Amino acid sequence: MKRSIILVLDSFGIGATEDAVDFGDVGSNTMGHIAQACARGEADNGDRSGPLHLPNLNKLGLGKACEESSGYFPEGLDPNVEITGAYGHAKELSSGKDTPSGHWEIAGVPVLFDWGYFSDHDNSFPKELTDRILKRANLPGFLGNCHASGTHVLDELGEEHMKTGMPIFYTSADSVFQIACHEETFGLDNLLTLCQIAREELEDYNIGRVIARPFTGPGKGQFERTGNRRDLSLEPPATTVLQKLVDEKGGDVISIGKISDIYAGCGITKKVKANGIPALFEATLEQIKQAGDNSLVFTNFVDFDSAYGHRRNVAGYAAALEYFDKRLPEVLELLQEDDVLILTADHGCDPTWEGTDHTREHIPVIVTGPKIPAGSLGRRETFADIGQSLAEYYGTSDMEYGKSFL
């Protein structure tokens, strides 16, 4: 019985790529810098302390993958452990370092075109664009119109938004148009309708995602994002391995978390909502138990990126990794004879790096299963090697990009 599980530790890069110079990311290393901070005692909080402790991931080859990628073996991990998984690192062929590019490339479809961006840090959006959105949504105006951290913009503009009913429009270095609105005073349904309008009006701008950022709370310092985020993505520009599995093999692709949004629903047969790493883990375990032949369980653990990477929270990132590692054996225990488990990422987001944006890094490619031989997979020239490997595993037609490691 053919079953695979992909767990994406969103933003968990393991060392800068050769082209990081083009992104201002030379020297970035999400995993490496977290490990260094932990070893120096700079990542202690109420949830964790001391050196980074990831024995299960390390046993599968994560430490070795980081070393092959960056030349640095993460402090706190045992360099002499017996490796039981196949491990490697992959560079990104896509032009960007964003979520859709990384995920689409994982599924065999690299983004070889340039996304549209709103590059101006202030007055970021064209007036003709925002005028059309406001007219269709029957809104008097909007706030923001800038590059901003999602948490900072709530403190700066959240109270004014609640008083005026004007949505907060903002962007970042990624190809995104983000809209933040209060769930109670503005309404979640109204926010989602507004985002759909924005998605339609952005068609000519080639913007990767419109992101709904609902929040709650009474005032500054007390606002919190909710779990009702929605990503309205463009559709992948070519057929992904997910679609081939469904169309050619009658298979099932189970999306957990924001996976379905990232692929605009393409190739997804079941969508499971869960918020937070514990809930995402529980949902993953339940779907693995239910999964049948020719199925793919695909989970994105977004909090590594959104709650810790972008917020430059090293201690929180380390604690989340250790939680993930502690629960990983629960997944391993569910693997059947022919199952393949792939642990990977979609880009980097080094919490020690300047700014709040993603970092251009190699991603780990950790593969295990009862029939997967242990050892190094070496450097993979594209994330699409994962998609090509899945195409070979399921017996679909080949992907245009990538080489199988199975």
From Swiss-Prot:
Residues reported to bind Mn(2+) 2: 305, 310, 358
Residues the record lists as binding Mn(2+) 1: 10, 346-347
Keywords, ordered alphabetically: Cytoplasm, Isomerase, Manganese, Metal-binding
Cellular compartments annotated: Cytoplasm
Record carries keyword ATP-binding: no
Origin species: Photobacterium profundum (strain SS9)
Entry keyword Metal-binding: yes
Disulfide feature: none
GO annotation, biological process: 2-deoxyribose 1-phosphate catabolic process; 5-phosphoribose 1-diphosphate biosynthetic process; metabolic compound salvage; nucleotide metabolic process
Gene label: deoB
Any one Gene Ontology molecular-function term assigned to this protein's record: magnesium ion binding
Biological classification of the source: Bacteria, Pseudomonadati, Pseudomonadota, Gammaproteobacteria, Vibrionales
Role summary: Isomerase that catalyzes the conversion of deoxy-ribose 1-phosphate (dRib-1-P) and ribose 1-phosphate (Rib-1-P) to deoxy-ribose 5-phosphate (dRib-5-P) and ribose 5-phosphate (Rib-5-P), respectively.
Name of the protein: Phosphopentomutase
Alphabetized PANTHER family for the sequence: PHOSPHOPENTOMUTASE
